[in-house]
Amino acid sequence: GLFLFNKNHQAADEPQLDMSRIPAHVAIIMDGNGRWAQARHLPRVAGHKQGMQTVKKVTIAASDLGVKVLSLYAFSTENWKRPESEVSYLMDLPIRFFNTFVPDLVKHNVKVTVMGDITKLPEKTQKAVNDAMADTKDCDGMILNFALNYGARDEIKRAVQSIAQQAAAGELDPASITEDTI
């Protein structure tokens, strides 16, 4: 398996990491932070805060290892069903994350991208996300791709709606729809 290690302090008996086997794209579903906190008798938000610190470490490690794309499933469309106080905290996390971490991302040449419908996020969260993308737009190293307000069904729904609108406007022949259209 793949593991992380400190390059300068590797024990002699530890196996070497095969750099030719580093995946080009790593995707992580960030799930279980709340349960992690509850198991330690902490509030759920403490788990989300700890998760944010872990994301920072994983991002730098992935970049250092040569991963091309790191996708983090951070907030799904289903997460809106959580308690309002938890959702509010989760909406503030990107603000805190980017305010403290963008300089490190730029230093490591990491470009921030987002998939999902961020127009449904609070304005201050949208601003933090958009600022992070703008601040890292010239970086050409690893791509740090956040799935925010993302859900596969929602993505399919939005694609179908867009295609239907184009067809209704006479801009697209339904018979010409291919996988590439979607």
What are these language model-derived features?
Residues 1-182:
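Flexible, compositionally biased loop and terminal segments
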